[in-house]
């Protein structure tokens, strides 16, 4: 009996290995991995800067489309804009799904977020509502909030410049609440910490294969006290933070609005536009979810972009001086104007913002798309439910398109006459995702950074820190290596350019 059972086991293993080899021959190239179920390339997967490893694998296997089996999760990595465009954009109807993460969606409560909603009717409804208000033209209605936040940031920096990172996070969050709900954000509001914690948890849990519960969903039923169920305890903390992040501002707005204590906002406008003959509960649920999108985008990605902008200005003072020369030509008697990114008289600043989103890839691998049915590309089989990663870092660091890609160089987008050179690929499109799942807040994020950057450089010289002898200290241009990328914390100095700075910024 034992011999028979042993024979069946051996036969099963042989069948698995042979069938795997046959199937593997039809898949895109990639590292071979270990031919054991739920193992595959698990031990090949990098913990830090995976975009660099994926690019190197592409070179090793002479391909721009890679296949890996990460512990049972099939993944395809696209290392060039050509493959990304062919699949995620031209075949967007089948490449627009999302990983239905048990950890992120169910346990951590991120099922409200457009970025993680399954492609379908609900996604279309919420995306349509959000995109209408935050289109390139639509964001103009929120310009006052962007300018106000930029001016208040200058005021804070004149008082406590050493807390610049906290001030940026606070003002971006305050702007998000103003735009989304028409309410204010108090100093040291616990909501801000909850938002930071929720986004921090998301960055950790978004890494495919990080938690076993995504491969084995039944693990979600384990009690939190069970040995090895640390993920349940983490999820509980992160979910409470996410719930507070979504619920608090909406409930505050609903409470204050009847008293006339809120300003016009995205949520208030959508509530007023509700179909009174329709399903009011459903409509309000959609409004609440999409209003939270304003903060989700600003709470992490825009903060990262602003921090990277400051880092670039410190590392490249010659760039800073050129931007300031443009700005000074528009400054009237030391007063800081309310800048508008549509101003054609500031081409160098606009080029600087383009370069910023290329130089600091906030999501180097973007959020993975999920293939909704089997597909064939270049003769390769890409199986249904494969997670498809766009290696944005590789696209934006392609030396054939952007020579010396590690260097922050706005001039690459300008012609000899100093005017925009439209023959150079605009990196901002790649920086905000691809196809039908690109970031719907792209226009708000770009204009926010543009306005804040212009305002800061009008008010301050951003300089390197100095040592005890007054000698400038060099700081490295280092970034974190997780799923979402941020500059590693650094010090700098904000030196007012005139004595009028604090008096000239009173806000609109």
Swiss-Prot record:
SUPFAM superfamilies: Cytochrome P450 (SSF48264). It holds the Pfam family p450. PANTHER family: P450, PUTATIVE (EUROFUNG)-RELATED, P450, PUTATIVE (EUROFUNG)-RELATED-RELATED. It comes from Psilocybe cubensis. PROSITE patterns: CYTOCHROME_P450. Pathway: Secondary metabolite biosynthesis. Cytochrome P450 monooxygenase; part of the gene cluster that mediates the biosynthesis of psilocybin, a psychotropic tryptamine-derived natural product. The first step in the pathway is the decarboxylation of L-tryptophan to tryptamine by the decarboxylase psiD. 4-hydroxy-L-tryptophan is accepted as substrate by psiD as well. The cytochrome P450 monooxygenase psiH then converts tryptamine to 4-hydroxytryptamine. The kinase psiK catalyzes the 4-O-phosphorylation step by converting 4-hydroxytryptamine into norbaeocystin. The gene is psiH. The pharmaceutical interesting psilocybin as a treatment option against depression and anxiety is being investigated in advanced clinical trials. This is Tryptamine 4-monooxygenase. One of its GO terms (biological process) is psilocybin biosynthetic process. The keyword Heme applies. Residues 1-19 form the signal peptide. Its cofactor is heme. Gene3D superfamilies: Cytochrome P450. Belongs to the cytochrome P450 family. It catalyses: tryptamine + AH2 + O2 = 4-hydroxytryptamine + A + H2O. Its EC number is 1.14.99.59. Keywords: Heme, Iron, Metal-binding, Monooxygenase, Oxidoreductase, Signal. Heme binds at residue 439.
